[in-house]
Amino acid sequence: MSMTSLSTKSRRQEDVVIEGWLHKKGEHIRNWRPRYFMIFNDGALLGFRAKPKEGQPFPEPLNDFMIKDAATMLFEKPRPNMFMVRCLQWTTVIERTFYAESAEVRQRWIHAIESISKKYKGTNANPQEELMETNQQPKIDEDSEFAGAAHAIMGQPSSGHGDNCSIDFRASMISIADTSEAAKRDKITMEDFDFLKVLGKGTFGKVILCKEKRTQKLYAIKILKKDVIIAREEVAHTLTENRVLQRCKHPFLTELKYSFQEQHYLCFVMQFANGGELFTHVRKCGTFSEPRARFYGAEIVLALGYLHRCDIVYRDMKLENLLLDKDGHIKIADFGLCKEEISFGDKTSTFCGTPEYLAPEVLDDHDYGRCVDWWGVGVVMYEMMCGRLPFYSKDHNKLFELIMAGDLRFPSKLSQEARTLLTGLLVKDPTQRLGGGPEDALEICRADFFRTVDWEATYRKEIEPPYKPNVQSETDTSYFDNEFTSQPVQLTPPSRSGALATVDEQEEMQSNFTQFSFHNVMGSINRIHEASEDNEDYDMG
């Protein structure tokens, strides 16, 4: 499905504003590719491999942009008649570079883009609103052998006690209403926590093990610098992570307790999974047994299936983002690259992710859908069972060629069921990939490799993990890099180089993060009626 409409097949030739051949620069393998582009009067800029045939429905585009509120810039080097368009890809601002056959052709395209952009600039109108339809939840065949898997994927186990993830959503709404007065009294700041150890450090900030003073509970707090987020144009990714964490409650997703902001920082207070990254454990063991890989794979499939049911594509599957909790269960972390509002058939084309884990359709400059996550699952499960990446080269161009055209190789010890699963997940064509159909995760649940899995028991954490991290206490950080845990716990003040920011500049920076704060009500439902926890219910800020 096109980003800008329910279906390109519903478009009409008479709605085309301008069309013709342009060369577009690839985003990964950065060569120039001829594409037949069309601008429609609703602001859609669609690119096709070949000119659409007259009198026939438009095919699905390779490129799909929205030029409402677009900006353009002209260049003459390294090629003449170049131009750059800064526009929207879903909710993300992106830049794409083109060149035309002549200055006159380029000017016609610039004029069309600017005319459309001016038409919609500053409006909240959705030119495709009349084409939108409700995304219906599928009905489950209760007599099916895989009914339990379907319930687990949807986060609706058909029986059993479950945990907070299975609590009726209406109960959470009641708890919000009942505790609104308490919420008004409860504003979370850094002063509410004791900082204990640094768990990780990156460009945008730090992750620190902390203890909430009021409850004495341990959390991992991710503290990000606002100025760096803005300078690196990561505002959209940061806000997406916040929204996804707020929306999604699942046993195998890291749970957000609070998000709040200080003058210079954004803070995510999250569950602390002290079993460390799966990457650490694979590196230590070399390979996992197939039963161990099956256990982790089943939990990952359920979590991603749940995200997909919420119309969210994860897009950053890698061993470093798969944590183990103290009992040995999976916790998927880091939701900054998620893309929202992507259901079956929907596409996006933003380049993101770790090079070794990128799916072929991403590298080939195609729009892609939720099936990229199943490619990522194929890569991490290959690493677990084979001890190496399926495709690897230090040279990124060579790496990308291997991902797009290389053959899979398996160690002789691998079972036929494991080979079939990995081969299905690592199919180059996303439409033929295991999980690529409308049933999504359920296709993978049916694989012979997962034949012995009780999916509902897996969801309820009733299956004993094959490995339990050897942690001595709640504050044990032995599975985290000593390079970080040995560092002093302190925050680096924002850079003061150059002139101090004006009041207007400060207000502009803060305006990027309005409505950021969140206090987790869902996680407190089971404690609503405990007198000692009367103040444990929080507001939505």
UniProtKB/Swiss-Prot annotation:
The modification Phosphothreonine is found at T350. The gene is akt-1. The PH domain binds to phosphatidylinositol 3,4,5-trisphosphate (PtdIns(3,4,5)P3) resulting in its targeting to the plasma membrane. The keyword Magnesium applies. PANTHER family: RIBOSOMAL PROTEIN S6 KINASE. Its cofactor is Mg(2+). GO terms for molecular function: ATP binding; calmodulin binding; metal ion binding; phosphatidylinositol-3,4,5-trisphosphate binding; protein serine kinase activity; protein serine/threonine kinase activity. Phosphorylated and activated by pdk-1. This is Serine/threonine-protein kinase akt-1. ATP binds at L199, G200, K201, G202, T203, F204, G205, K206, V207, K222. Acts downstream of PI3 kinase age-1 and kinase pdk-1 in the daf-2/insulin receptor-like transduction pathway. Phosphorylates Forkhead-related daf-16 and the longevity-promoting skn-1 transcription factors, which inhibits their entry into the nucleus and antagonizes their functions. Plays a role in maintaining the gonadal basement membrane through it's role in inhibiting daf-16 activity. Has an essential role in regulating developmental arrest at the dauer stage. Plays a role in immune function and pathogen resistance. Regulates salt chemotaxis learning. The active site is at D316. Belongs to the protein kinase superfamily. AGC Ser/Thr protein kinase family. RAC subfamily. Keywords: ATP-binding, Calmodulin-binding, Developmental protein, Immunity, Innate immunity, Kinase, Lipid-binding, Magnesium, Metal-binding, Nucleotide-binding, Phosphoprotein, Serine/threonine-protein kinase, Transferase. Residues 451-528 form the AGC-kinase C-terminal domain. Residues 193-450 form the Protein kinase domain. Disruption phenotype: Increased resistance to pathogens. Simultaneous knockdown of akt-1 and akt-2 result in dauer formation and a weak extension to life span. Expressed in neurons, muscle cells of the pharynx, rectal gland cells, vulva and spermatheca. One of its GO terms (biological process) is intracellular signal transduction. Interacts with pdk-1, sgk-1, akt-2 and daf-16. Part of a complex containing sgk-1, akt-1 and akt-2. Interacts with cmd-1 in the presence of Ca(2+). Interacts with let-92 phosphatase regulatory subunit pptr-1. The modification Phosphoserine is found at S517.
